[in-house]
């Protein structure tokens, strides 16, 4: 089974490309570290398969929490990222959520309906 990591980014925020890249990196690193500790077998598979990562866009913060609720109910590692507010958004603004790494079939059940960023 294919293993991947997905990051869902809010599109209602006025973030530049560099800011989005940094937020996605925060989500990916946070999820990877958590998976390395909590889901070692899946993490190792993901590493061996080339660390597939997908970034999708969601309309707003409400959608982030809908994704989180579903991921939590399925036991999928997830990390909601809140910005510190030094540059483009207010402190504490939720910018994205990372999911996985986990099996693609499970992540697609949660994020498959969203368009790629």
From Swiss-Prot:
Top-level class of the enzyme under EC nomenclature: hydrolase
Keyword Hydrolase: yes
Keywords: Cytoplasm, Hydrolase
GO cellular component annotations of the record: cytosol
Compartments reported by the entry: Cytoplasm
Catalytic activity: an N-acyl-L-alpha-aminoacyl-tRNA + H2O = an N-acyl-L-amino acid + a tRNA + H(+)
Protein family: Belongs to the PTH2 family.
Protein name listed in UniProt: Peptidyl-tRNA hydrolase
Organism this protein belongs to: Thermoplasma volcanium (strain ATCC 51530 / DSM 4299 / JCM 9571 / NBRC 15438 / GSS1)
């Amino acid at each position: 089974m294919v293993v991947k990591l997905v990051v869902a980014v809010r599109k209602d925020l006025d973030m530049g490309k560099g800011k989005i890249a940094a937020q996605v990196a925060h989500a990916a690193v946070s999820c990877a570290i958590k998976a390395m500790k909590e889901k070692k077998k899946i993490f190792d598979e993901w590493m061996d398969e080339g660390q597939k990562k997908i970034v999708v866009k969601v309309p707003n913060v409400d959608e982030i929490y809908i994704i989180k609720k579903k991921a939590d109910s399925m036991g999928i590692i997830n990390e909601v990222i809140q910005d510190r507010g030094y540059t483009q958004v207010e402190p504490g603004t939720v910018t994205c959520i990372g999911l996985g790494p986990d099996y693609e079939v499970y992540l697609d059940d949660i994020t498959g309906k969203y368009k790629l960023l």
